């Protein structure tokens, strides 16, 4: 009888030990925190589980063996859903499985900023931050049928883009991104801003065209309103804008220096040859340049040229003779700088 009781006791202890081991293993995979930091995972189509796991650095993993065992047991390559995922601090290994299997994506910041004046470069800027291919982005920016749904054309699509930081899913389509841009565009064009544009005799798209020239003329934002005032004065007086950046646009921004011969390039974008505004923006205008056109300085200036101080500012003039003096002053300063080898 005692022997039988001993056997039962030993068997019970073995069951407890086994259950404890199984329970401990379950706890390690399903409840015990296994990450000491965050990691970004980017899952592309056709990726394998091993390729995804390789994106999690050892430095934030408490138990790599546990992570590999749990994920490989519960997740097949075919279960992976493309997207951007974030491994959070203090999460258990099984969280990675659930996140990837259920497609619990985390949005990314799509940053549209800096100089954006060529569709190819804009396409690369977007593609570098998204799962999209740059050719797919470029095609969308030239797709008349797609853009007409937003009220734009390939010629004026730069007007639609409002530089900012946008939260989007990494797997977003170009239509998703354009939807975001249209929402931002509509948000910018409040009743107040529409009234300001109308007061200047401009449509919103025309404001973008002038703003693109203003932005292309200077990197010094405090001068934007003064430069905008010059171009609006010329426009209202029926003068040709004679904006050098429009010539640079005609040559695909390949010129190091604009010469007199370049001013003869026959294009509706060449404001030396054609009166009024070009057909579309010559770059993506930012909010400061748009606001400068809506709130221009009130002055009588019709000309401006680079300041002889070479500090990125400009000198403004109301008459052509005054402008020529400023231009000669700048040329002398430029010649002196070249002579000194600076």
What are these regions (language model features)?
Residues 1-38:
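N-terminal type II signal-anchor transmembrane helix
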Residues 1-8, 42-45, 57-60, 318, ...:
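Intrinsic structural disorder
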Residues 4-9, 16-18, 50-53, 74-77, ...:
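Generic detector of short, locally flexible boundary/turn motifs and exposed helical patches
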Residues 7-10, 37-40, 78-80, 119-121, ...:
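Short low-complexity stretches enriched in small and charged residues
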Residues 11-16, 58-59, 82-84, 136-141, ...:
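N-terminal start-of-chain detector that recognizes signal peptides
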Residues 25-188:
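Signal peptide-directed extracytoplasmic domains
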Residues 48, 131-135, 146-342:
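Bacterial extracytoplasmic/cell-wall-associated proteins, especially those involved in peptidoglycan
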């Amino acid at each position: 009888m005692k022997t039988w009781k001993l056997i039962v006791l030993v068997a019970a202890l073995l069951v407890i030990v086994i259950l404890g081991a199984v329970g401990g293993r379950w706890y390690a995979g399903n409840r015990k925190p296994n990450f000491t930091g965050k990691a970004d995972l980017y899952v592309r189509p056709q990726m394998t589980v091993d390729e995804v796991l390789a994106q999690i650095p050892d430095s934030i993993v408490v138990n790599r063996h546990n992570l590999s065992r749990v994920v490989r047991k519960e997740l097949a390559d075919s279960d992976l859903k493309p997207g951007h995922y974030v491994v959070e601090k203090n999460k258990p290994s099984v969280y990675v499985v659930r996140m990837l299997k259920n497609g619990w994506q985390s949005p990314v910041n799509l940053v549209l900023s800096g100089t954006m004046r060529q569709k190819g470069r804009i396409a690369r800027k977007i593609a570098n931050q998204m799962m999209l291919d740059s050719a797919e982005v470029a095609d969308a920016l030239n797709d008349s049928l797609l853009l007409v749904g937003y009220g734009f054309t390939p010629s004026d699509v730069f007007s639609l883009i409002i530089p900012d930081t946008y939260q989007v899913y990494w797997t977003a389509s170009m239509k998703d991104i354009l939807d975001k841009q249209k929402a931002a565009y509509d948000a910018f064009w409040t009743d107040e801003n529409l009234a300001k544009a109308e007061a200047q005799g401009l449509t919103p798209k025309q404001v973008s065209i002038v703003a693109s020239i203003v932005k292309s003329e200077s990197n010094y934002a405090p001068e934007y309103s003064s430069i905008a005032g010059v171009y609006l004065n010329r426009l209202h007086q029926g003068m040709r804008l004679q904006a050098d950046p429009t010539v640079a646009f005609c040559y695909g921004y390949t010129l190091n220096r604009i010469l007199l011969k370049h001013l003869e390039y026959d294009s509706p974008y060449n404001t030396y040859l054609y009166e009024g505004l070009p057909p579309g923006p010559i770059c993506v205008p930012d909010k400061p340049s748009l606001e400068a056109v809506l709130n221009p300085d009130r002055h009588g200036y019709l000309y401006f040229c680079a300041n002889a101080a070479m500090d990125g500012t400009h000198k403004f003039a109301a008459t052509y003779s005054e402008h020529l003096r400023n231009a000669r002053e700048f040329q002398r300063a430029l010649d002196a700088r070249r002579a000194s080898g600076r």
